[in-house]
Regions:
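C-terminal cap/substrate-recognition subdomain and adjoining C-terminal extension
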Residues: 83-97, 104-226
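Short, surface-exposed acidic
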Residues: 36-42, 67-71, 118-119
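Catalytic cores of large soluble enzymes that bind and process phosphate-bearing ligands
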Residues: 20, 50, 76, 147, ...
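Long, low-complexity, intrinsically disordered polar/charged segments
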Residues: 7-11, 15-16, 59-63, 68-72, ...
Length: 226
């Protein structure tokens, strides 16, 4: 559905694999390679366990002693997707509310986004390093309306809290963690695995590779004149 005839667009943008070129959680797991993490990843992707349970399980395989090494590694290796800075500037220029809604973890989401902010809001999971292994905290869990009740950062619940009846939702994402949000969006801008799921389920989408593509899509859909 085109959004040019709808009012008050609000953008909900994923972080891992969307703002960043790679999925930072997967990058961490590949680098530190705790035994059993790949099995958990496959269970998340085939939806045999919830995203919340799976991501928590993966991080529980890592000792807290690795905290500094993990943080240093993820901040060094993360690559911001081409055009993101221009895209953020565009949303400010056009007065389009932009929320980052991420299944990622605060210790890398906030530092990586800091040069580009401020944003209208950043929603992500948190890490607790007080025990023997890394424990995840989920401050943005599912509301009563969520059908899965197993999200980590529940993107549809965040969207429902922010939107009014007059708002139009634009979801930008790449993975299984964006699927439930895509199902309720007025416009989906997708890449990678999310495209496969949209095609499988008959969800209309626009494809992107860089954030220059995203800006062009929004220009066309919203009828923005620069």
């Amino acid at each position: 559905m085109g959004v040019n005839n709808l009012s008050k667009p609000i953008i909900f943008c994923d972080f891992d694999g969307t703002v960043t070129a790679n999925d930072n959680i997967i990058a961490i797991m590949k680098k530190f390679n705790p035994p059993g993490w790949e099995t958990v990843k496959d269970q998340i992707l085939d939806q045999s366990i919830s995203i919340r349970e799976g991501v928590a399980k993966m991080f529980s395989l890592l000792p807290v002693e690795a905290k500094d090494d993990i943080i240093s590694y993820v901040l060094e290796q993360a690559e911001i997707r081409e055009g993101f800075s221009d895209f953020v500037a565009y949303t400010k220029q056009q007065q389009l509310p932009l929320y980052i809604v991420s299944g990622g973890i605060d210790f890398f989401v906030y530092p990586l986004l800091e040069p580009f902010g401020p944003f209208d809001g950043i929603y992500c999971n948190s890490a607790d390093f007080s025990g023997d292994t890394i424990k995840l905290v989920f401050p943005h869990g599912c509301d009563e309306t969520c059908t899965s009740q197993g999200c980590g950062c529940c993107k549809p619940s965040v969207m429902r809290r922010i939107m009014s009846e007059q708002s139009t939702s634009i979801v930008i994402g790449d993975s299984i963690t964006d699927l439930q949000a895509a199902k309720q969006a007025d416009l989906v801008i997708a890449r990678d695995f999310l495209i496969d799921k949209c095609e499988e389920l008959g969800i209309a989408y626009e494809a992107f590779e860089s954030f220059h593509d995203v800006t062009d899509i929004l220009d066309a859909k919203l009828g923005v004149i620069s």
